[in-house]
Amino acid sequence: MAAELEYESVLCVKPDVSVYRIPPRASNRGYRASDWKLDQPDWTGRLRITSKGKTAYIKLEDKVSGELFAQAPVEQYPGIAVETVTDSSRYFVIRIQDGTGRSAFIGIGFTDRGDAFDFNVSLQDHFKWVKQESEISKESQEMDARPKLDLGFKEGQTIKLSIGNITNKEGGASKPRTARGGGLSLLPPPPGGKVTIPPPSSSVAISNHVTPPPIPKSNHGGSDADILLDLDSPAPVTTPAPTPVSASNDLWGDFSTASSSVPNQAPQPSNWVQF
């Protein structure tokens, strides 16, 4: 079921690759590209590297139609499925297989050295990813095999927490914090704080009355209009002489002396006739 869910992804595509028939390896020293007929390739076409699951596939296809010429499954790299030659970095030996299980070794080569580098790196990156996935899967299995740690409370189990400024078990409230630094405190008033005013001097008398000036008489002759004007003018009001105020009733003393020393100012005569 897991194999059916796996999808095929393309790792590398190179449009130009040459295929060579190689002679059998005479010793264990490795393959040499100089032993091949490099100027007469047996087949040319396109190379495509795909992956499905953990296995990579090197596919040799026709450039125009895309028909599959040969395929080399790779399950490990470096390994027997893909080998490098000893005398060049642009040529490799791959093991191709058909559907019946038969296999053969052929040589492939790239004209551009950069294409050979991409071919090599694509296989390395794929199997590096396969290795990381295997390690992650192994670690997860080990974690599942370990006994799980039970951190829950058992039945009847209690714990005690100590938190500041909270009423304790005996019911006593926590002590209030005292203010430290920076605060201003108001002092209470002194006991018996009554303001006493000293009595004023008995020799000072206050006169709050100002005598109005006499009304000047008219300089005109004794005409009838003057007589009428004199009749219309108000009669002078006689005011009694000011009586001195006793020193016991004076509460401000020296302030009254300043008010009594102000000279009386006579009002200016008015030219308006009062009716």
UniProtKB/Swiss-Prot annotation:
<dbReference type="GO" id="GO:0006897">
    <property type="term" value="P:endocytosis"/>
</dbReference>
<dbReference type="InterPro" id="IPR012466">
    <property type="entry name" value="NECAP_PHear"/>
</dbReference>
<keyword id="KW-0488">Methylation</keyword>
<dbReference type="InterPro" id="IPR011993">
    <property type="entry name" value="PH-like_dom_sf"/>
</dbReference>
<feature type="modified residue" description="Phosphothreonine">
    <location>
        <position position="211"/>
    </location>
</feature>
<keyword id="KW-1003">Cell membrane</keyword>
<keyword id="KW-0813">Transport</keyword>
<keyword id="KW-0653">Protein transport</keyword>
<keyword id="KW-0472">Membrane</keyword>
<keyword id="KW-0254">Endocytosis</keyword>
<feature type="short sequence motif" description="WXXF motif 1">
    <location>
        <begin position="252"/>
        <end position="255"/>
    </location>
</feature>
<comment type="similarity">
    <text>Belongs to the NECAP family.</text>
</comment>
<feature type="compositionally biased region" description="Polar residues">
    <location>
        <begin position="256"/>
        <end position="275"/>
    </location>
</feature>
<feature type="region of interest" description="Disordered">
    <location>
        <begin position="211"/>
        <end position="275"/>
    </location>
</feature>
<dbReference type="Pfam" id="PF07933">
    <property type="entry name" value="DUF1681"/>
</dbReference>
<dbReference type="GO" id="GO:0005886">
    <property type="term" value="C:plasma membrane"/>
</dbReference>
<feature type="short sequence motif" description="WXXF motif 2">
    <location>
        <begin position="272"/>
        <end position="275"/>
    </location>
</feature>
<comment type="function">
    <text>Involved in endocytosis.</text>
</comment>
<keyword id="KW-0677">Repeat</keyword>
<dbReference type="GO" id="GO:0030125">
    <property type="term" value="C:clathrin vesicle coat"/>
</dbReference>
<dbReference type="GO" id="GO:0015031">
    <property type="term" value="P:protein transport"/>
</dbReference>
<feature type="region of interest" description="Disordered">
    <location>
        <begin position="166"/>
        <end position="191"/>
    </location>
</feature>
<protein>
    <recommendedName>
        <fullName>Adaptin ear-binding coat-associated protein 1</fullName>
    </recommendedName>
</protein>
<comment type="subunit">
    <text>Interacts with AP1G1 and AP2A1 components of the adapter protein complexes AP-1 and AP-2. Interacts with the GAE domain proteins GGA1, GGA2 and GGA3.</text>
</comment>
<keyword id="KW-0597">Phosphoprotein</keyword>
<keyword id="KW-0968">Cytoplasmic vesicle</keyword>
<feature type="modified residue" description="Omega-N-methylarginine">
    <location>
        <position position="180"/>
    </location>
</feature>
